[in-house]
Amino acid sequence: MLTKKEQRLRRARQTRIRIATQGVARLTVNRTNLHIYASVISGDGVKVLASASTAEAEVRKALGGSGKGGNVAAAQAIGKRLAEKAKAVGVEKVAFDRAGFAYHGRVKALADAAREAGLQF
């Protein structure tokens, strides 16, 4: 039997394969207990077009500097910031790659904030 982490990584790999056949940029999310990271990667999977995370100094300052990057409010801020950066480089449409994480909580908050800020997926 696969462990919980191995199952998540297998789901993530299968999702990346499906997204690669579409040829659109993908918004990928990684979360840890302390931080959340998001990137927009080109359709061919070679180049990172935009990225944002709660580990960035100016994001931490905007969140109050308390190091609370592992909550829903922080995820919403990252989603909005990432959408703005992606639109600045000309990316409007992406495929959402949640990397095997459940679409719930911080992952959902990030996705909803990115949609509200103008990304389509």
Curated annotation (Swiss-Prot):
Transmembrane segments: none annotated. CDD domains: Ribosomal_L18_L5e (cd00432). GO terms for cellular component: cytosolic large ribosomal subunit. The keyword Ribonucleoprotein applies. Keywords: Ribonucleoprotein, Ribosomal protein, RNA-binding, rRNA-binding. GO terms for biological process: translation. GO terms for molecular function: 5S rRNA binding; structural constituent of ribosome. Belongs to the universal ribosomal protein uL18 family. This is one of the proteins that bind and probably mediate the attachment of the 5S RNA into the large ribosomal subunit, where it forms part of the central protuberance. HAMAP family: Ribosomal_uL18_B. Part of the 50S ribosomal subunit; part of the 5S rRNA/L5/L18/L25 subcomplex. Contacts the 5S and 23S rRNAs. NCBIfam families: L18_bact. This is Large ribosomal subunit protein uL18. The gene is rplR.
